């Protein structure tokens, strides 16, 4: 491990940010800190994770939602101080790492099958 990677690992440890495990296809609610004038509030952004980029301190994920019939995508830096929390609403069952094909789809064709928990063998 070179010096830059060590520094990034130390910075991640110093931030101490714990986010739940999520993957592309999952529906998440991201609480974002928004500054309006002199006050700060949390804004919820709910959508489907269409991409995840794992690059240590530079990790990011992209969330897509439908707003007034229009698709809206937003990319969040995983270790950003503006991301207050991430909550997983439902797990999606997909076979791709990047779900960019959802950009061209709306309605029923844009639905993602839910991943059900594994049944216990007994």
Curated annotation (Swiss-Prot):
It comes from the Bacteria. GO terms for molecular function: structural constituent of ribosome. Pfam families: Ribosomal_L19. Keywords: Ribonucleoprotein, Ribosomal protein. Disulfide bonds: none annotated. One of its GO terms (biological process) is translation. The keyword Ribonucleoprotein applies. InterPro entries: Ribosomal_bL19, Ribosomal_bL19_CS, Ribosomal_bL19_sf, Translation_prot_SH3-like_sf. HAMAP family: Ribosomal_bL19. Belongs to the bacterial ribosomal protein bL19 family. This protein is located at the 30S-50S ribosomal subunit interface and may play a role in the structure and function of the aminoacyl-tRNA binding site. This is Large ribosomal subunit protein bL19. It comes from Chromobacterium violaceum (strain ATCC 12472 / DSM 30191 / JCM 1249 / CCUG 213 / NBRC 12614 / NCIMB 9131 / NCTC 9757 / MK). The lineage of its organism: Bacteria, Pseudomonadati, Pseudomonadota, Betaproteobacteria, Neisseriales.
């Amino acid at each position: 491990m070179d010096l830059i990677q060590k520094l990034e690992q130390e910075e991640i440890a110093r931030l101490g940010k714990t986010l739940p495990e999520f993957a592309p296809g999952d529906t998440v609610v991201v609480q974002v800190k928004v500054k309006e004038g002199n006050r700060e509030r949390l804004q919820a952004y709910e959508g489907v994770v269409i991409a995840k980029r794992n690059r240590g301190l530079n990790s990011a994920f992209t969330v897509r939602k439908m707003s007034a019939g229009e698709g809206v995508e937003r990319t969040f830096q995983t270790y950003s101080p503006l991301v207050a929390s991430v909550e997983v609403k439902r797990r999606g069952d997909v076979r791709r790492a990047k779900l960019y094909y959802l950009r061209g789809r709306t309605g029923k064709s844009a639905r993602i099958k839910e991943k059900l928990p594994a049944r216990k063998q007994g």
